[in-house]
UniProtKB/Swiss-Prot annotation:
Primary residence: membrane
UniProt-recorded name of the protein: Putative uncharacterized protein YPR150W
Transmembrane segments: 9-29, 32-52, 100-120, 127-147
Subcellular location: Membrane
Zinc is among the record's keywords: no
UniProt topology in membrane: Multi-pass membrane protein
Additional note from the record: Almost completely overlaps SUE1.
Lineage: Eukaryota, Fungi, Dikarya, Ascomycota, Saccharomycotina
The entry's keywords: Membrane, Transmembrane, Transmembrane helix
Signal sequence, start to end: none
A single cellular component GO annotation: membrane
Superkingdom to which the source organism belongs: Eukaryota
Disulfide partners: none
Length: 173
């Protein structure tokens, strides 16, 4: 029984490192593509609010800004952004069971990324585009770190797409 618990814990640790590795690969790809004529980038939507830096150069994560108005705090979506396309014109992602693995995997990735960002925020902030300020609390992230198998309606804009992860609870009334 003890050996089984140790083995399970080891597998869990390995999975976390694999997730971090994939996250950093995505980050590197994003940075390289941004430098090369704003190629394919990753776009994060928080309750229908787009965050971007430069001319359609979009980092993987950018939570340095306060969310506007009646957005749903804590809801994260992962999308591909076509170069030189305005951020508000994005092909919708079909809501189908085929996306459930993407929803689950993205939830794990972003949850791990935010916890990791809490540790390295002051060291690598400029490189990672990660921050836990602007009204977000670390407690909110911890209580909201759970895999998500549902598609959340977060706003009239974001509800058109597949929301693939949730960090924290929706605060939209």
């Amino acid at each position: 029984m003890r050996n089984r618990a140790i083995k399970s814990f080891s597998i869990c640790i390995c999975q976390i490192f694999i997730i971090y590795f994939i996250f950093f690969l995505l980050l590197c790809v994003n940075r390289i593509c941004s430098a090369l004529s704003n190629g394919f980038n990753f776009l994060i939507i928080y309750g229908g609010t787009f965050f971007h830096s430069g001319k359609y150069s979009i980092p993987i994560l950018d939570v340095d800004h306060q969310l506007n108005g009646n957005s749903s705090l804590g809801t994260v979506g992962l999308y591909f952004h076509v170069p030189f396309t305005p951020p508000d014109i994005i092909p919708p992602v079909p809501r189908s069971p085929n996306n459930m693995f993407l929803c689950f995997f993205s939830s794990i990735v972003f949850a791990s990324a935010f916890v990791f960002s809490f540790i390295v925020n002051n060291v690598c902030k400029d490189f990672l585009f990660l921050s836990l300020n602007s009204g977000f609390s670390f407690t909110g992230y911890i209580t909201g770190l759970y895999p998500l198998y549902r598609i959340s309606r977060v706003s009239s804009l974001a509800s058109k797409y597949c929301v693939v992860g949730t960090l924290g609870s929706d605060l939209k009334s």
